[in-house]
């Protein structure tokens, strides 16, 4: 939505929020984008809508930033639905067919919220996994990002070491890939 037409959000049944959550200089998450958007749209929200957060957030952020504000106006799980479903786009992946094959994590504040989020994403994704809570889904996203960052860091360090020893890192990775378990290549 263009912010000039933000009032049209009341026409939507499902609102997906996926805004950046960069780190501040002190390494705390910058939540101002999320805080501003919920403040901006709350007055236009109506009963029976569903908000799904896709931004990368820390555990309990959905509750702190969204649920606490929305529960003042709505009965979450009864007349308004709140879910969290982290985006899982692979950097550099541009083929939509591959995107729809990624398992989509879904969660919601109540069983009814989880059911509604699940039904929505099953229209888009072949595989949907229901997390038992929003906090599990939030932490899973952080775990996935940490796993990737640690392994990219390891790959970079191994590359530097291989360069010093005049060994081709790509040949090392190719050889390591022959192990059928416990190894995943990172470039």
Where are these regions (language model features)?
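Structural/interface elements that position substrates and couple domains in central-metabolism enzymes
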Residues: 1-187
